Amino acid sequence: MPPRKRCDTVFGMAHPWWVNLLIVVPFTSYLFWRREPVLITRAHLLASALFAASFGMVEGTVVVYLRAVLAAAAGYGASVFAVAQFSRNFNPAMLQSAVLPISLLRVEVCREAATMLMLITVAHLGAHSRRGRWAIFLWTFAIWDLTYYVTLCTTIRWPSSLTAADVLFLIPIPWISPVWFPLLVSTLCIAAVLHSRRSILGHGVTDA
């Protein structure tokens, strides 16, 4: 795989350039919902939040194991302490070098695809309308993402700063950005869904 440009953690630019467009998703979704509020009950929000938080912890744990493989290959060892030390020196370019065998990289791509399918399935089951399903998807994705980083922080003390570079996704090519970027997008997505739900309660919809 040819080397790719690292993200500029000083200015917060993600790569490829179109990854930066994710910041508009919560804003455009909120404007879309203002025209016609989505119908999501408290029970659906709670159930999907519990799923997302649990799944985020599983996702974070899997990444700890993946980094243990990378740490062992780089000579750090495979203990939690070694993984934490390796993570402090983690560079997204490591995923594009011989450190990670191409066979494992393909497995990781398949895992990411399965993750998206699971989140889409939960969104489909959690609402009946397209608006509602989109809201549930953003809600679960955001909570999953935040819990993922909380899991990494509590287990291997990573990221050490919000400007640390991270690989967000590998499909179709690696998405690289500073950690603060996905945290901001996820927080805004949660805020957009919650604010829209307040609008729902104001429209006389029964909350259950």
Model-derived regions, located:
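Hydrophobic transmembrane alpha-helical segments in integral membrane proteins
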Residues: D8-V24, I102-L105
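Alpha-helical transmembrane segments of integral membrane proteins
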Residues: W18-V19, A43-A47, F51, R111, ...
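Hydrophobic cores of alpha-helical transmembrane segments in multi-pass inner/ER membrane proteins
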Residues: N20-Y30, A114-V122, S177-S196
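Membrane-interface capping segments at transmembrane-helix boundaries
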Residues: F32-L39, H195-V205
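Membrane-interface helix-loop junction between the first two transmembrane segments
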Residues: F32-L46, V62-G75
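Interfacial segments of alpha-helical transmembrane regions
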Residues: P37-A53, G126-I143, V205-A208
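Transmembrane alpha-helix/helix-exit interface in multi-pass inner-membrane proteins
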Residues: G56-V69, A142-S160
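Extracytosolic (periplasmic/ER-lumenal) interhelical loops and adjacent juxtamembrane/interface segments
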Residues: V63-V109, S161-V179, L183
